Amino acid sequence: MAETETTADRNVEIWKIKKLIKSLEAARGNGTSMISLIIPPKDQVSRVAKMLADEFGTASNIKSRVNRLSVLGAITSVQQRLKLYNKVPPNGLVVYCGTIVTDEGKEKKVNIDFEPFKPINTSLYLCDNKFHTEALTALLSDDNKFGFIVMDGNGALFGTLQGNTREVLHKFTVDLPKKHGRGGQSALRFARLRMEKRHNYVRKVAETAVQLFITNDRPNVTGLVLAGSADFKTELSQSDMFDQRLQVKILKLVDVSYGGENGFNQAIELSAEVLSNVKFIQEKKLIGRYFDEISQDTGKYCFGVDDTLKALEMGAVEILIVWENLDTMRYVLKNHTTDEEKILFLKPDQEKDKTHFTDKDTGVEMEMVESCSLLEWFANNYKKFGSTLEIVTDRSQEGSQFVKGFGGIGGMLRYRIDFQGMEFNDDDPDLYDDY
């Protein structure tokens, strides 16, 4: 369970960065006062601070007064942000500062600094009329890490593939006796010795796989591909010696004509289609499980904004499933006469109706305290409700059905909830007076 939770948390981080990239790419400024700064892990904050001080000196010579002041202001903002860090975080640091022009033509200051969800091995400093997000986009493209085990009669190779980066983790050679018809009375003994050596070889591969592909008691790869000539790979996948936690991660067995690095390259080519569909398959499985709950009428499911939020408040939602393009907005409104706060969830077509933003009794317009998309609010708060957040697309058949049929929001519950009974009870305020 813990392993799936980390995958889900990672997917939420990825969604947040995608959203950030979208808003940063759309932003434009006057002049060259928009600074993009990326510091890789193990770099020194002091080096970057010195570089910014030098840049400040250079920028003081810009002829245009307006541009000069805005560039100097942006550099000062970046320097202030850097003072918050004693050292560069383990995954590096990304800073965006500058003055952007909004759709209404007003100027707005933007200061963003964060540590990415995985190491960013890029060093960048640019002053431009836009923010540079290429390095962040690259960070998203190669997210899943896959393990490869290539076995043949001469030895085994262990490697990983992440995006376009392949890495050989370990390899060793073996000297296995070949089959032969000699030996007379000892032929059976020779065959037994041969089988024993094969058995030991498979055991060594299984033990090495645990050392390389399991950290902190959970697999560190999204999936495993077993490759090789002959039937070693099949023997390994069916063997009791192969760790159960890795067994469930096997995506494909592929036949390759070579061992070693050449076999590794061939295995990557042959399994490319399976690897590209992993996210897709996980999503299909998840929504399939959700549909199973509904078809079996277990009562351990919810859909629609209202029911899902009720179940969240009760701490009943185990897995919260939300479509990545859910357009519902969350508003917090305040009535100044009574000091009461009211929370609304509106679709784009409902937002145009201004009666939602006025008090029904007095007709007074309420002040908007907070507004953000419901999905963004979920992404920031789902852990408070003890849930796992899964953000899905509508590209699979199941995903499309989930969006069209269930409004793109739903959840799998820890226990059964009678929503109709709750609605009935809500109408009767005296019901709970005795408790």
Swiss-Prot record:
One function term, GO molecular function aspect: translation release factor activity
Top-rank taxon of the source lineage equals Eukaryota
Q: Which InterPro entries match?
A: eFR1_2_sf, eRF1_1_Pelota, eRF1_1_sf, eRF1_2, eRF1_3, Peptide_chain-rel_eRF1/aRF1, Ribosomal_eL30-like_sf
Sorted UniProt keywords:
Cytoplasm, Protein biosynthesis
Localization per record: Cytoplasm
Q: Name one Pfam family in it.
A: eRF1_2
SMART domains named in the record? eRF1_1 (SM01194)
Please indicate if the UniProt record lists Iron as a keyword: no
A Gene Ontology cellular component where this protein is annotated is: cytoplasm
Does Nucleus appear among the keywords?
no
Location (main, coarse):
cytoplasm
Role noted for this protein: Directs the termination of nascent peptide synthesis (translation) in response to the termination codons UAA, UAG and UGA.
Q: Which family does it belong to?
A: Belongs to the eukaryotic release factor 1 family.
Quaternary structure, per UniProt, is: Heterodimer of two subunits, one of which binds GTP.
Supply the name of the protein: Eukaryotic peptide chain release factor subunit 1
Species this chain originates from:
Polyandrocarpa misakiensis (Tunicate)
